[in-house]
């Protein structure tokens, strides 16, 4: 049996824990939840819920033979940062897939990724490692999501659409078929992307246009 450590005990970490103990793998006894890794030892103080313990900071943890990990960081850059720390220690990662998700048997989901409930992953979709697909997302056929990508709730990606590494599509955003967004891109909530988007840009609106902060 494997022992899951969730890296991050803040809001997303708690949501990941709630999902992890409802997966079929957990119910089948494939793993237990050993605890959280977080530098803030009192991150769970004062909260309702029966949470596993915060063991120590990720940087201080020594990987054990039956350990598996999930990086529960909402920001892609921090997800990548801590994934690389754990990987350098020899750690291995688990993907968490909610039972209510609809996933085509031809889809590929990279290690350490999260597929939330009621999302639809269509034919020949490829999702990279440590990516997040939130509630009620619809990924059309042949869609590609890069490593550390984030697709927030109620978003839609048409056939052959592509999302680059460390990019985020915020709530209810749309990427129409055959269009691509590059690496480190942010698409604002409710935006409709109708053209390719280059690396590092922030776009917002319908149709989505470049914005500067």
Regions found by a protein language model. Give the residues of each.
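NAD(P)-binding Rossmann-fold cofactor-contacting core
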Residues: 23-46
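Short hydrophobic segments within beta-strands
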Residues: 6-7, 37, 72, 152, ...
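Short active-site oxyanion
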Residues: 3-4, 32-34, 66-69
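Phosphate-bearing ligand-interacting subdomains
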Residues: 41-102
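Structural signal for interior beta-strand "rungs" in well-ordered beta-sheet cores
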Residues: 95-211
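Short alpha-helical
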Residues: 11-14, 42, 77-78, 108, ...
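Glycine-rich adenosine-cofactor-binding loop
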Residues: 2-21
């Amino acid at each position: 049996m494997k022992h899951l450590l969730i890296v991050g005990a803040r809001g997303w970490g708690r949501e990941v824990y709630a999902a992890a103990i409802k997966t079929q793998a957990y119910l089948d006894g494939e793993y237990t939840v050993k605890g959280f890794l977080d530098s803030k030892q009192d991150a769970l103080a004062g909260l309702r819920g029966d949470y596993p313990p915060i063991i120590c900071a990720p940087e201080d943890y020594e990987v054990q033979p039956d350990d598996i990990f999930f990086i529960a960081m909402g920001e892609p850059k921090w997800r990548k940062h801590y994934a690389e720390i754990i990987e350098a220690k020899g750690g291995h990662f688990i993907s968490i897939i909610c039972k209510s998700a609809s996933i085509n048997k031809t889809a590929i989901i990279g290690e350490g990724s999260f597929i939330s409930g009621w999302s639809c992953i269509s034919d020949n979709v490829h999702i990279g490692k440590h990516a997040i697909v939130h509630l009620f997302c619809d990924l059309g056929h042949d869609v590609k999501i890069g490593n550390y990508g984030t697709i927030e709730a109620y978003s839609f990606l048409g056939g052959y659409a592509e999302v680059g590494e460390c990019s985020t599509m915020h709530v209810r955003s749309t990427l129409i078929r055959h269009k691509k967004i590059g690496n480190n891109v942010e698409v604002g909530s409710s935006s409709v992307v109708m053209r390719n988007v280059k690396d590092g840009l922030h776009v917002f609106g319908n149709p989505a246009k470049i914005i500067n902060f």
